A protein has these predicted regions:
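N-terminal core-entry segment
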Residues: 2-272
Length: 272
């Protein structure tokens, strides 16, 4: 496979990862989910719910919940664990996502690539689970199958991006749960919202520019906020894309796309 180069990254010259991701999000169906994946997903959801409860009274969550309540806005989703206060979906995602990572107890994706630091990639559950919860509320509810499909769609997108990207991403100081988690949240929200075609492509481009989190903030309140912001930004990208907001439709690909800029490139072998 030919390699397209810039000074900082090596990426496949003819990759179509953005298109593949958009197609996967649009075409994924509940009936196609393997039973083993559903069993794992149920465990992840239960674990995530426990993490939300555990993180509700953590100082970082309490401060964020108070700020979200003060800012108010359209009451789309509950600030879970904080009474009956309802706030915009993106604000609820920020608070809930942060509570899920407040104690750093959430599950981990283990890499098949020994080059990845500690053999770990990301904490994959909380961003797509949070996006699924808040958007289900914002859109008036979802069936159990719709909810699980959205969650697993986001989970799969997040884990694939984490595995395919070079390990330089984490070594350069990015916190992958905050960065790559944004894609998981976007995919989950977009699936529940029924986004299709170019709205998915633009949404992935938006997500690529919103994905953030740096490791110097480990040990502070801001580390769990990375995951809260991943959930918030993924939801925001989906909502903006639904309205027709535009971005580069191949933002995961190319010499200046997400993989190149934040990860130094992508493994061509893993794409084959």
């Amino acid at each position: 496979m030919a390699i397209q180069q810039n000074r900082f990254a090596d990426v496949p010259a003819e990759s179509h990862i953005t298109e593949s991701a958009a197609t996967f999000i649009e075409q994924s169906r509940y009936d196609d989910i393997p039973s083993e994946a559903l069993a794992i997903a149920r465990r992840c959801v239960l674990d995530g719910m426990g993490l939300y409860v555990a993180g509700t009274d953590h100082e970082t969550t309490v401060l964020l919940a108070a700020a979200a309540a003060d800012q108010a806005g359209k009451g789309e989703a509950l600030l879970l664990g904080h009474g009956d206060t309802r706030v915009p979906a993106a604000s609820a995602a920020r608070v809930l996502g942060t509570s899920g990572h407040a104690h750093d107890w959430d599950d981990s994706q283990v890499s098949i690539d020994p080059d990845h630091v500690y053999g770990l990639l990301t904490h994959p559950t909380i961003p797509p689970l949070t996006a699924s919860l808040v958007m289900s509320q914002a859109r008036g509810g979802a069936s159990g199958q719709e909810f699980m499909l959205a969650f697993l769609t986001g989970f799969e997108v997040e884990c694939k991006i984490s595995e395919w990207m070079f390990s330089q991403h984490y070594k350069r100081g990015f916190h992958s749960s905050g960065t790559v988690g944004t894609f998981g949240a976007f995919a989950a929200a977009a699936k529940l919202m029924g986004l299709k075609g170019d709205k998915l492509r633009h949404g992935l481009g938006l997500t690529a520019s919103l994905a953030a989190g740096i490791r110097c903030n480990f040990g502070t309140m801001t580390k769990p906020l990375h995951v809260g912001r991943a959930a918030e930004n993924g939801v925001t990208a989906a909502l903006l894309a639904e309205r027709g907001y535009t971005a580069d439709k191949q933002a995961l690909d190319g010499p200046w796309g997400y993989f190149a800029v934040q990860g130094g490139g992508i493994s061509a072998e893993k794409l084959e």
